[in-house]
Design a protein with these regions (language model features):
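Conserved segment of the helicase C-terminal RecA-like domain
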Residues: 228-242, 391-422
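Conserved helicase motor
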Residues: 148-156, 160, 170-180, 187-194, ...
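Conserved interdomain linker/interface between the two RecA-like ATPase lobes of SF2 helicase motors
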Residues: 251-314, 318, 330
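Post-DEXD/H (motif II) to motif III coupling segment of the RecA-like Helicase ATP-binding lobe
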Residues: 199-273
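Walker A/P-loop
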Residues: 111-133
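N-terminal pre-P-loop "Q-motif" helix
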Residues: 91-114
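Conserved RecA-like helicase motor core of SF1/SF2 enzymes
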Residues: 206-209, 344, 348-401, 409-414
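Interdomain "pre-motor" coupling segment immediately N-terminal to P-loop NTPase/helicase cores
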Residues: 28-82
Length: 432
């Protein structure tokens, strides 16, 4: 590793060289706080009975995948340095007046040293609204990171930023190439655990998504990764209670955009009664009501994305679909699918016509012209936030700002009602 690649990084003792020790700040690996021991890197409280190597030496089990932290060793931080400022924005598109208002507000918030929340509907163009504030920071020689909880979203975002920004960009996730220092970093939120006071601007996209939401370890990671005088921007289509509280306390500024970039309303889900979905699928059959809905949709020749709650159900349903629709190309994807990215791209290009997915594709991916069905939308896994995100896959393209969006179930849950209510309220706020 080059010395400059360690700037802004949080390193364990085993990662240190003599050259690095000369410029590093020593930090306690495990601190004692009010009689309890706490990991400096991830903030976890240490179980003194179980998390120990000997009677005298404790370690942190919570973040051990990043390298073991021991109470008898130190952590080391190498101070971040400014970059050489540069013009770097290649994007030739234009923002709508609504998007421009948010973009300008974010630039002013950063100049004023404020943190901000962008609460914008799915398909509002949140990424494009970030371009100017990112470009402004990098032009001033600042270090910027865009972090998101999901690898799929991270990789798709990296591809877009590579196309629209000319500066070097590093991509960081569990399966990525080794890190090298760049003015712009695209990373999963877990990768923030490897940084310390590294970024002048930290943008956390999909802040409501698992595994970031309600995860104190990842909150600590974000807190450590930002410089003391740095700014954090949060992006979401479904805000969290914690962020709403911060807005009320005026700890962060809120910018809301209830209108999609193409100016059309959000597609509101329809609820369709389909009894015994799971029972029939597990027997190798597709419920009659569901079969008729799929047949009707396939006559349109638009791609069909079907969400399921569990991997086993998705696998069985995909096999059932192949039997009933032998002329269609049907594929199932989940977190366990090794070539998921290729399949997603083939679905986008219509080489795959019907895609069955777990909630791994609930957010961060765009499929023009797509229709969406949610099987067992009354399943406990389908929370309001998840259903709003899934609904946001429909109607995202200017060429087809509408689409078929069905919640298929044999009951209506509070989460389903709340999701539909929120979508209708956003449309109302946008003037529809």
């Amino acid at each position: 590793m080059k010395i400059e690649d360690s700037y802004g990084r949080l390193l364990t003792q085993s990662q240190m060289t003599n050259d690095l020790k000369e410029i590093a700040q020593e930090l306690p690996a495990i601190e004692k706080q009010n009689g309890r021991y706490q990991c400096f890197r991830c903030g976890s409280l240490i179980d003194q009975k179980l998390w120990k190597l000997s009677e005298e030496v404790l370690y942190c089990r919570a973040c051990i995948q990043l390298g073991r932290i021991r109470s008898d060793q130190k952590l080391y931080a190498i101070a971040q340095q400014n970059f050489e400022g540069q013009e770097l924005l290649n994007w030739k598109g234009t923002l709508t007046s609504y998007q421009q208002e948010v973009s300008d507000g974010l630039i002013q918030a950063v100049k004023a040293g404020k943190h901000a929340l962008v609460h914008a509907v799915t398909g509002a163009g949140k990424t494009e609204m970030m371009y100017q504030v990112v470009a402004t920071a990098i032009k001033a020689g600042k270090a910027v990171c865009i972090a998101t909880p999901r690898i799929d979203v991270c990789i798709e975002l990296y591809g877009r930023m590579k196309k629209d920004f000319s500066c070097p960009i590093s991509l960081l996730h569990g399966e990525s190439e080794p890190y090298f220092r760049t003015p712009l970093v695209i990373a999963t939120t877990h990768q923030l655990l490897k940084f310390y006071q590294a970024f002048d601007l930290l943008i956390i996209d999909e802040v409501d998504a698992f595994p970031y939401v309600d995860n104190p370890i990842l909150y600590k990671a974000a807190q450590n990764a930002i410089k003391k005088e740095g700014n954090t921007l949060y992006l979401t289509a479904t805000s969290t209670d914690e962020l709403d509280k911060k807005v009320k306390k005026k700890e962060i500024i809120r910018y809301s955009l209830p209108r999609r970039f193409h100016g059309k309303p959000l597609v509101v889900p329809e609820i369709k009664w389909v009894p015994k979905i799971r029972e029939k699928i597990e027997k190798g059959r597709i419920p009659y009501e569901l079969l008729q809905l799929i047949k009707k949709q396939r006559k349109t020749h638009y791609p069909l994305l079907i969400f399921v709650s569990e991997i086993e159900l998705g696998q069985q349903f995909t096999e059932d679909l192949k039997k009933y629709f032998p002329k269609e190309t049907v594929v199932f994807v989940s977190s366990q699918t090794t070539d998921r990215l290729r399949m997603v791209e083939e679905f986008r290009n219509r080489a795959i016509t019907m895609l069955v997915s777990t909630t791994i594709l609930e957010r961060g991916v765009t499929f023009p012209f797509v229709d969406v069905f949610v099987l067992e939308s009354n399943h406990k896994l389908f929370t309001k936030s998840t259903l709003v995100q899934i609904s946001g896959r429909v109607g995202r393209s200017k060429e087809r700002p509408t689409g078929k969006l069905l919640f298929l179930s044999d009951g209506i849950t509070r989460e389903m009602k709340k999701a539909i209510k929120e979508i209708k309220e956003m449309n109302q706020e946008a003037g529809f």
